[in-house]
């Protein structure tokens, strides 16, 4: 899954709202529970290096393995360099990793015998040498070179320790390359220069994003200290020279990738290891801005590594101290799982304030999740996904609409122009952009005329990948619901959008069956693709699921996206009551949902599975949601390097873990949190504006998790039977007390206890097919 996931199912946004607006006390050093290596194997793609909360600078060792999307992995790959900006948990292609520093000792101390290409310079690392703590990363390579790094907002600081003698190379002089490349070798053109008097290196380059269109420009300013320089110069391909001190490269003949950069060779210490330090300033504006960032944030010439490191730790302690726990004696496995997940949810979005080259603004600017209304105001459309200043590919719906509705219903109103927000989401719903692969929606002619996105849709208004007709239909339905929510709240047009939000029903084929390995599953009625003329197409309900062929945006693209019809059929977040009735009532709905989970059809490593874990609440069976949460945590979400079951997607998997373990899981775009027992005895959140504290407390809690079913609940001492609660609980504070037992009870099962739905029987007047 790629970084757009936060927009498709944006529980991460809600976590950001809570965490950024609360300030609870913490006991001791919460950083001891953060393991940055969680999710660095098995496709988690988590970034494990040094970063501030939402920081632009992200320093780590880059490796050459196929899973190096976050720079470093724990799967035994080789280190190719150390770079300063990364994303975390994303898919598509590896992102950033621009201008890596490459420490080495060259054969016979001959600069022309240095290893310039990634393939030649790759060196394995000593596994137990890896040390990661918030704001810090350290590693030792098999060639004896050790590296440690820390960061500020826009700069990285490295220590490289070179061994006194390197028998393998028969040399002793430290060399550091500054390479004109990135992780995915996407550089289009670049330039680099070196001042031989100050040893300052400036570089710039144009690169491709990981999952989108266009290019972005990146700039660095590198200073060195700690050892006297012997020689400096440039290299191109596999040759180097002391003159000139600057070089520019393009993509090369026939798009051949030209290897180039600068080198610095230092004198070695006469009596022990040689330390060379490097300060790297970063910018998206220009090289001078990169230098200013470095000089401002890590001033002077004798850089205080420990101060930078402790300042970074303090920033993380402040952020991670926002939520307080009473553990109740649970294993440290669960503490590490919880705090590591919160940590990963705060790596992105990245604060690029002051580093926006797209337009002049003094407003806060975040990338990798973009500032939505600012984007609309300056570029004309809400984005579905954004990274490295570039427009990212839309995966199904126009899910910025969901994010905006989510903020509105949760009363996040400070300095938000809601009229502009409504204008933006209505444009998504009514106007098709020329390129709807990166913004807005495609197929709007059909959406308005027949009430669904047809298979093989004839769409001449814009261009995009005309697949995913089922996924787009169910997501457009929810997008329109969210437009209606905002419209109703603002006293503007909303009924039309509420009506359109029922369009998902137009793809429900009541007699469709499903067979797995030739055996009838026993369930009848599934979504199916439909042509514009109303006739039905066919897609096997298990295709694109966890037990069949994977379907991505560009490879094996089908009528559903990254999940099959079996999973898509449950995505009606706004009208579960209608869906439950359509599937035969509560009992049959629960049986079908059980089958989805128990037959391994659902892939918990992608965001479409998030909501499906907790839909039992709508059928009056909240105990089964709690059971499912404990099924997936810690079996799939845990504190190991493989403890993220799929791409972490900029902390989306982390946010799933945090909300599930807190016992309050949001339905994004609605003022609804599903109530379950927290994985700890108590969880508290304090709101700094209201000064109120919201606490969820378990009674009869046991650390072995035998009592995971709610028997009764009270809110501020009064009986509480609803199995959900609104965001006002966090705004106003209070105590939600849950009495637990070993068996499912009648709590939260009544018709009036389930979360709200838009309602059955939505009139779809004007739609051709019903």
Curated annotation (Swiss-Prot):
Residues 746-770 are annotated as: Disordered. It is an enzyme of class 3 (hydrolase). The keyword S-adenosyl-L-methionine does not apply. SUPFAM superfamilies: Six-hairpin glycosidases. Glycans are attached at residues 78, 204, 533, 638. Its EC number is 3.2.1.-. Its main location: secreted. It comes from the Eukaryota. Keywords: Glycoprotein, Glycosidase, Hydrolase, Secreted, Signal. It is found in: Secreted. InterPro entries: 6-hairpin_glycosidase_sf (IPR008928), GH-type_carb-bd (IPR014718), GH92_N (IPR041371), Glyco_hydro_92 (IPR012939), PNGase (IPR050883). Residues 1-24 form the signal peptide. GO terms for cellular component: cytosol; extracellular region; nucleus. One of its GO terms (biological process) is glycoprotein catabolic process. GO terms for molecular function: carbohydrate binding; hydrolase activity, acting on glycosyl bonds; peptide-N4-(N-acetyl-beta-glucosaminyl)asparagine amidase activity. Belongs to the glycosyl hydrolase 92 family. PANTHER family: PEPTIDE N-GLYCANASE PNGASE -RELATED, PUTATIVE SUBFAMILY (AFU_ORTHOLOGUE AFUA_6G13760)-RELATED. This is Uncharacterized secreted glycosidase ARB_07629. It comes from Arthroderma benhamiae (strain ATCC MYA-4681 / CBS 112371).
């Amino acid at each position: 899954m790629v970084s757009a996931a936060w927009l498709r199912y944006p529980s991460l946004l809600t976590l950001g709202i809570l965490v950024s607006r609360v300030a609870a006390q913490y006991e001791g050093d919460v950083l001891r529970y953060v393991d940055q290596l969680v999710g660095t194997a098995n496709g988690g793609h988590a970034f494990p290096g040094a970063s501030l909360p939402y920081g632009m600078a992200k320093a780590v060792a880059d490796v050459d393995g196929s899973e190096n999307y976050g720079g470093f992995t724990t799967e035994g790959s080789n280190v190719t360099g150390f770079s300063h900006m990364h994303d975390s948990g994303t898919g598509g292609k590896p992102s950033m990793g621009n201008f890596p520093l490459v420490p080495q000792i060259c054969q016979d101390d001959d600069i022309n015998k240095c290893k310039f290409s990634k393939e030649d310079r790759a060196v394995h690392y000593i596994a137990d040498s890896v040390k990661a703590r918030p704001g810090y990363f350290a590693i030792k390579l098999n060639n004896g070179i050790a590296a440690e790094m820390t960061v500020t907002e826009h700069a990285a600081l490295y220590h490289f320790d070179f061994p006194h003698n390197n028998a393998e190379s028969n040399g002793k002089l430290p060399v550091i390359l500054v390479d004109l490349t990135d992780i995915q070798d996407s550089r289009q053109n670049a330039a680099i220069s070196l001042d031989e008097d100050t040893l300052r290196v400036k570089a710039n380059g144009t690169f491709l994003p990981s999952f989108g269109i266009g290019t972005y420009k990146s700039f660095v300013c590198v200073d060195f200290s700690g050892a006297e320089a012997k020689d400096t110069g440039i290299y191109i391909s596999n040759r180097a020279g002391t003159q000139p001190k600057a070089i520019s490269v393009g993509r090369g003949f026939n798009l051949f990738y030209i290897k180039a950069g600068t080198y610095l060779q230092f004198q070695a210490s006469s009596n022990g290891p040689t330390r060379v330090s490097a300060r790297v300033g970063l910018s998206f504006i220009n090289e001078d801005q990169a230098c200013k960032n470095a000089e401002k944030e890590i001033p002077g010439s004798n850089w205080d590594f420990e101060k930078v490191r402790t300042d970074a730790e303090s920033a993380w302690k402040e952020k991670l101290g926002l939520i307080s726990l009473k553990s109740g004696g649970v294993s440290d496995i669960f503490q590490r799982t919880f705090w590591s997940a919160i940590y990963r949810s705060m790596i992105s979005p990245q604060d690029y304030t002051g580093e926006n080259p797209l337009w002049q603004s003094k407003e806060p600017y975040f990338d990798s999740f973009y500032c939505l209304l600012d984007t609309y105001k300056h570029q004309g459309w809400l984005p579905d996904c954004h990274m490295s200043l570039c427009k990212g590919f839309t995966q199904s719906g126009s899910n910025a609409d969901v994010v905006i509705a989510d903020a509105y219903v949760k009363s996040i109103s400070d300095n938000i122009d809601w009229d502009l927000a409504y204008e933006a989401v209505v444009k998504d719903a009514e106007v098709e952009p020329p390129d709807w692969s990166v913004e807005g929606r495609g197929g709007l002619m059909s959406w308005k005329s027949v009430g669904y996105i047809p298979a093989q849709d004839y769409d001449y208004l814009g261009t995009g990948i005309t697949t995913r007709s089922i996924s787009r239909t169910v997501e457009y339905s929810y997008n329109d619901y969210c437009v209606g929510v905002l419209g109703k709240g603002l006293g503007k047009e909303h009924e039309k959008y509420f009506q359109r939000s029922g369009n998902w029903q137009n793809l429900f084929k009541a007699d469709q069956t499903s067979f797995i390995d030739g055996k009838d599953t026993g369930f009848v009625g599934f979504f199916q693709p439909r042509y514009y003329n109303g006739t039905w197409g066919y897609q096997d309900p298990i295709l694109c699921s966890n037990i069949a062929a994977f379907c991505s945006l560009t490879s094996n693209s089908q009528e559903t996206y990254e999940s099959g019809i079996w999973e898509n059929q449950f995505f009606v977040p706004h009208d579960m009551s209608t869906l439950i009735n359509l599937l035969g009532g509560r009992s049959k709905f629960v049986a079908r949902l059980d089958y989805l989970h128990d037959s391994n059809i659902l892939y918990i490593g992608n965001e479409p599975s998030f909501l499906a874990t907790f839909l039992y609440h709508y059928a009056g069976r909240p105990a089964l949601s709690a059971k499912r949460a404990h099924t997936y945590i810690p079996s799939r979400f845990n504190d190991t390097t493989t403890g993220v079951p799929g791409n972490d997607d900029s902390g989306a998997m982390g946010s799933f873990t945090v909300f599930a373990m807190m016992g309050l899981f949001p339905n994004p775009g609605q003022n609804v949190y599903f109530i379950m027992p927290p994985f700890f005895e108590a969880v508290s959140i304090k709101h700094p504006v209201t000064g109120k504290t919201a606490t969820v407390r378990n009674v009869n809690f046991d650390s072995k998790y035998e009592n995971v079913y709610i028997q009764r609940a009270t809110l501020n001492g009064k009986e509480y039977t609803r199995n959900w609660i609104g965001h006002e609980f966090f705004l106003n504070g209070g105590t939600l007390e849950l009495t637990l037992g070993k068996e499912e009870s009648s709590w939260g099962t009544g018709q009036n206890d389930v979360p709200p739905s838009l309602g059955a029987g939505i009139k779809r007047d004007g739609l051709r097919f019903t």
